[in-house]
């Protein structure tokens, strides 16, 4: 089942984000095939303000555990983080569901 993890940074999190980024990238690489989409959320000036991760997990509990394992969470980067079930309807311009 797909889940969207939507996380918003704390206003003062940039230094912590940069420090934790190498561990965050290793965590993402280790997740490999579980990941569908990953990327930063940007503000009007193009600065990072959070992130979205769409991941394949067996259930909501597993998706929440996966989200909490993100090194950005442990580094106190995020102000909020929500996990939602997600259904992919279009991919690369083609309907898939």
Name each region found by the language model.
Residues 1-97:
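Conserved, structured core segments of small domains
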């Amino acid at each position: 089942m797909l889940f969207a993890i939507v996380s918003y940074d704390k206003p003062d999190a940039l230094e912590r984000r940069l420090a934790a980024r190498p561990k965050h990238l290793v965590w993402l690489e280790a997740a490999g095939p579980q990941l569908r989409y990953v990327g930063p959320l940007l503000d009007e000036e193009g600065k990072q303000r959070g992130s979205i991760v769409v991941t394949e997990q067996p259930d909501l509990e597993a998706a929440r555990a996966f989200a909490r394992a993100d090194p950005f969470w442990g580094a106190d980067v995020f102000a909020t983080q929500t996990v939602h079930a997600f259904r992919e309807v279009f991919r690369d311009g083609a309907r898939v569901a």
